[in-house]
């Protein structure tokens, strides 16, 4: 279906090497055959409680992204997401703290914050055009997913350097009294 849409909307005949999908809990409720090569849940918060009877119901919907046998990319800072880890499953973690050997996280060196893979610094946080811990966490998740897919590091870092964020997100509206 996506190939047809690409052909009709964008006049693209070649099949893409991969698809990047952002799926809501609503969409995941009706997803039965997804077997993503890599998937992540960035965090869990009590959203959409008008739709779900309990937080556990919401978590169960989000957990559906991990059906299949692909790499799980999980937020080590969120205990609910960490509880989704399946024994024996290939997984990468990301954290705003210092990462373990094969995980992604932040390293503090020389007075600077670095996005890192294990002990290896990949990109300085100051090189990014986005701000906020949530954006650093998202960038770490993206790097972990790209790494799991075997994407070239320089391509991923170039994309992060160029990314300006979404319109109206973390935009200064007014400064008052200082």
Model-inferred region functions:
Residues 28:
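Carbohydrate-associated surface elements
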């Amino acid at each position: 279906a996506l190939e047809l849409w690409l052909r009709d909307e964008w006049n693209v005949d070649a099949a893409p090497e991969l698809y990047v999908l952002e799926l809501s809990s609503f969409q995941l409720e009706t997803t039965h055959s997804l077997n993503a090569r890599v998937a992540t849940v960035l965090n869990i918060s009590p959203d959409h409680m008008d739709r779900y009877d309990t937080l556990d119901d919401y978590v169960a919907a989000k957990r559906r992204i991990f059906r299949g046998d692909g790499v799980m990319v999980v937020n080590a800072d969120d205990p609910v997401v960490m509880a989704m880890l399946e024994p024996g499953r290939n997984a990468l973690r990301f954290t705003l703290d210092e990462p373990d050997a094969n995980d992604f996280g932040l390293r503090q060196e020389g007075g600077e914050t670095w996005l890192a893979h294990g002990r290896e610094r990949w990109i300085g946080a100051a090189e990014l055009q986005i701000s906020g811990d949530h954006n650093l966490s998202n960038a770490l998740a993206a790097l972990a997913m790209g790494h799991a897919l075997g994407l070239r590091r320089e391509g991923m870092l170039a994309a992060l350097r160029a990314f300006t964020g979404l319109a109206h997100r973390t935009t200064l509206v007014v400064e008052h009294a200082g």
